[in-house]
């Protein structure tokens, strides 16, 4: 993904490629990519060539979780155990379809993921 961002004009000095659970910090704010259940690809030839992720954002005592596109998984409980509880969770919902059970969540799954994370406030997104 880093090469693609650089090709789009993002300065290489601003690009950081991370694996799940690998932390980075910017201006005192910690960013951690966490597990997600999805796939990647922009063209017919690059399927699953980059890692998908959720995001854990920590600023002092404030904790925010951003799910990104994801299906429900045990990863939410793992994230909650490692980084929770969260003040705010931004949870993917609304792109659900019977054909996409593994990569998007039904509303009740989004709520369960929020609870697994130990979330206080939930903002449904897509």
Regions found by a protein language model. Name each.
Residues 18-84:
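Core dinuclear metal-dependent hydrolase active-site scaffold
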Residues 1-2, 19-23, 94-95:
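Short, acidic/turn-prone active-site loops that include or flank metal/cofactor-
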Residues 3-7, 73-126:
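Cap/insert and terminal regions of metallo-dependent hydrolase folds
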Residues 12-14, 28, 87:
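Short acidic capping loops at alpha-helix termini that bridge into adjacent secondary structure
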Residues 8, 20-21, 52-55, 100, ...:
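A residue-identity detector for tryptophan
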Residues 14-16, 30, 121:
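Conserved beta-strand segments of alpha/beta enzyme cores
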Residues 2-3, 38:
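A short acidic, glycine/proline-enriched capping/turn motif at secondary-structure boundaries
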Residues 4-17:
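Helix-loop-beta element that forms the nucleotide-linked donor phosphate-binding surface
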């Amino acid at each position: 993904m880093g090469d693609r961002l650089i090709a789009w004009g993002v300065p290489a000095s601003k690009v950081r490629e991370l694996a799940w659970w690998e932390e980075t910090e910017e201006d005192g704010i910690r960013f951690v990519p966490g597990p997600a259940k999805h796939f990647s690809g922009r063209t017919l030839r690059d399927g699953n060539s980059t890692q998908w992720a959720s995001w854990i954002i920590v600023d002092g005592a404030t904790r925010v979780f951003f799910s990104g596109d994801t299906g429900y998984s045990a990863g939410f409980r793992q994230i909650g155990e490692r980084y929770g509880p969260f003040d705010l969770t931004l949870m993917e919902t609304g792109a659900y379809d019977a054909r996409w059970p593994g990569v998007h969540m039904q509303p009740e799954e989004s709520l369960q993921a929020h609870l697994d994370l130990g979330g206080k406030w939930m903002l449904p997104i897509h």
